[in-house]
Amino acid sequence: MKMNEKVILHDMSLRDGMHAKQHQISINQMISAATAMDEAGIPLIEVTHGDGLGGASLNYGFPAHSDEEYLSAVIPKMKQAKVSALLLPGIGTVDHLNMAKDLGVSTIRVATHCTEADISQQHIDHASKLGLDTVGFLMMAHMASVDKIVEQAKLMVSYGANCVYCTDSAGYMLPDEVSLKISALRDTLPSSIDIGFHGHHNLALGVANSVAAIQSGARRIDGSVAGLGAGAGNTPLEVLVAVMNRMEIQSGIDLYKIMDIAEDIIVPMMDQPIRVDRDSLTLGYAGVYSSFLLFAKRAEAKYGISARDVLVELGKRGTVGGQEDMIEDLALSMSKLCK
């Protein structure tokens, strides 16, 4: 993209941040953070369970409030920001889509594993027909070749998506790979289709990868204020805004205000520091889905097996988002082998 075009920054702290909070963000915290982001000029804010609409379950975790309660509380408070919702086919349904639309959600992001775009057809088609900003979200994009990512993106566009994301769910990708995949998407898809990038900070490359994506043609970039998100967190938005200001890339976001939100609102919400520790670093190194981190830590406490060893084995097995139930089974099996 041209560097004088505005980049749309999309906050994840109230959705991906749910993973770090075990889905226990209160309504008051949600409103406080969202209204401050709105005032700072953040144009898009994602609000749902960490695993998207309908994610409340024994497998993924029960939230403090329902998606409907969160969306009903936040959307009427917004003055300029729009609210998005994530949906994973097999977790979220068309009924959830209709509910989100009725409550005022403007953007639906339909997420699949990077080789399974075909399961998104029903949801993307329905969201598009509802008149929503409809995004295809290819997760764990490091696990597929450039050609496969392009192939899957074309499927999502054919279903009705007006934007497709290359999603580094594991925080595994290096800037060269980001540039290669984003460039291929931009060169192949129609100019009317936006390209997006979603990064995690497990190798401390969230900002660098996001800049590489922008320089390669991405117009939408995800991040979280103070990095609040799964693993070592998402790309920290306040840092990205500062870097973009230095590079004279427009975002429309007030840097000082977003810095203050990070320090005064988001950091006090954290149950533990969002940082690159040995376990989150292992996520990035082994290419493991970032939301597996707390599941692995809980398994470590329960079975006495190193979370790091569990994560490495999950990486070897090529596990993907949605297979959280395998983590405890694996830890139990590993603990028996150690006895």
UniProtKB/Swiss-Prot annotation:
The keyword Metal-binding applies. Mn(2+) binds at residues 16, 198, 200. Its EC number is 4.1.3.39. It comes from the Bacteria. It is an enzyme of class 4 (lyase). Substrate binds at residues 15-16, 169, 198, 289. It catalyses: (S)-4-hydroxy-2-oxopentanoate = acetaldehyde + pyruvate. The record marks 15 as: Transition state stabilizer. Residues 7-259 form the Pyruvate carboxyltransferase domain. Coiled coil: none annotated. Keywords: Aromatic hydrocarbons catabolism, Lyase, Manganese, Metal-binding. One of its GO terms (biological process) is catabolic process. The keyword Cell membrane does not apply. The active site is at 19 (proton acceptor). GO terms for molecular function: 2-isopropylmalate synthase activity; 4-hydroxy-2-oxovalerate aldolase activity; manganese ion binding. Belongs to the 4-hydroxy-2-oxovalerate aldolase family. This is 4-hydroxy-2-oxovalerate aldolase.
